[in-house]
């Protein structure tokens, strides 16, 4: 295993935001990956991350829902807030038990105010639209976010799972600081359009699930150990008919990591780190030992030949199964109507 080293700092985007080169995805502490973790343990892990130099903390109002933001708010008391860059998201509503993606101005503002209250802070550092509302022109959503920047409620604007054309349209209204997207050795379709678009526009790239939702940390046995309400149980890539094929990638990563003297997870994470100085992966974990391993990936150095070898075993399209079920929108269905089509209620 590669030992943890200091976490370098990096510029995210072109508007002045500086963050740790690796962030902490906080979702799994409260939602989707089984039962919520005990509050004291979750806060201890967050504090350990910050003490180790991981200062970009990523949450969303949908994690819990809402409870993850409350947890972060508690963890940032007593002067801790000033030590971190805090990112949260809006855009997925569960009002009256109905799941809905919303980007209308009224909802954008209400969601921001609610997040500020739950987090118990005056300003959000990086505020993402979690999913794109395909009924509302992105210019309308961005217009309200721009107002929130001007009012000092948020500092920087981000998009998550947005298409290349939506990113361009949004960026024309107000600079986008970061696009959060799934990027890992087994999710590489973003390399075709999303990544080049971000780089052309000077937008930072935040890679979520850089360990393939834990697959590269544990391999196929991950599925056997998932709690009954872990949403990964339903993901296409973890179904038996696809897993038998996908484990080939893990086995080859294991072979290379053994030669490198690091874990498979560290190797997979190092591959993301080596994509460029504009890329910040945000692996999540519920265990301090795993956090240390993730930070250790920063010390794994890969040669161009090793990068080529890794990419050859995980070429785009090789992995079987979609990232999500058909019910969850992604950048592939994230176009919005033209601004001329908008009629405010």
UniProtKB/Swiss-Prot annotation:
| GO molecular function terms attached to this record | oxidoreductase activity
Q: Which GO terms describe its cellular component?
A: cytosol; nucleus
Q: Induced by what?
A: Up-regulated by iron and sulfur starvation.
Q: Which residues bind substrate?
A: 130
Q: What class of enzyme is it?
A: oxidoreductase
Q: Which residues form the active site?
A: 63 (proton donor)
Which residue spans adopt a coiled-coil conformation according to this UniProt entry?
Answer: none
Instruction: Quote the EC number.
Output: 1.1.1.-
Keywords in alphabetical order:
NADP, Oxidoreductase
Q: Which residues bind NADP(+)?
A: 209-219
Q: Which family does it belong to?
A: Belongs to the aldo/keto reductase family.
* Record-given protein name: Probable aldo-keto reductase 4
Its lineage reads:
Eukaryota, Viridiplantae, Streptophyta, Embryophyta, Tracheophyta
